[in-house]
UniProtKB/Swiss-Prot annotation:
Ubiquitin is encoded by 16 different genes. Ubiquitin is generally synthesized as a polyubiquitin precursor with tandem head to tail repeats. Often, there is one to three additional amino acids after the last repeat, removed in the mature protein. Alternatively, ubiquitin extension protein is synthesized as a single copy of ubiquitin fused to a ribosomal protein (either L40 or S27A) or to a ubiquitin-related protein (either RUB1 or RUB2). Following translation, extension protein is cleaved from ubiquitin. GO terms for biological process: ubiquitin-dependent protein catabolic process. This is Ubiquitin-NEDD8-like protein RUB2. Belongs to the ubiquitin family. Residues 153-154 form a propeptide. It comes from Arabidopsis thaliana. It comes from the Eukaryota. Pfam families: ubiquitin. Expressed in leaves, stems and flowers. SUPFAM superfamilies: Ubiquitin-like (SSF54236). Residues 1-76, 77-152 form the Ubiquitin-like domain.
Length: 154
């Protein structure tokens, strides 16, 4: 099937894909056509950033759908947040982002309110007002998400 990828400059790229193709595959096809490295590509559909390991079918992307391509400038950092179920959520951050901002990004993707999130990195619980840089969180870092149960103090 054919899908379209629209860039911020307004250019539209036509791609031949299968619904079983992963977002990784689509980014590789964009690289073949446009020379843009996959790690600088962000694909958006229906207002959501598409995750690399998912397929077009996972996002209900059908023939003649239009994806939007946003380029990620170097300096942005891709980290992962791992849940207790083992699910990994990819989040694009800046070193100056606060932990609270990272929790907001987790909420955007997973619907978990920041107040219920505890983020752990290098064995430490992260304080909301500190930045990624304060904890030396960099590209490829994996944070662990633990949910704080509702209720009073123990």
């Amino acid at each position: 099937m054919q899908i379209f990828v629209k860039t911020l400059t307004g250019k539209t790229i036509t791609l031949e894909v299968e619904s079983s193709d992963t977002i990784d595959n689509v980014k590789a096809k964009i690289q073949d056509k446009e020379g843009i490295p996959p790690d600088q590509q962000r694909l958006i559909f229906a207002g959501k950033q598409l995750e690399d390991g998912r397929t077009l079918a996972d996002y209900n992307i059908q023939k003649e759908s239009t994806l939007h391509l946003v380029l990620r400038l170097r300096g942005g950092t891709m980290i992962k947040v791992k849940t207790l179920t083992g699910k990994e959520i990819e989040i694009d951050i800046e070193p100056t982002d606060t932990i609270d901002r990272i929790k907001e990004r987790v909420e955007e993707k997973e619907g978990i309110p920041p107040v219920q999130q505890r983020l752990i990195y290098a064995g430490k619980q992260l304080a909301d007002d500190k930045t990624a840089k304060d904890y030396a969180i960099e590209g490829g870092s994996v944070l662990h998400l633990v949910l704080a149960l509702r209720g009073g103090l123990l």
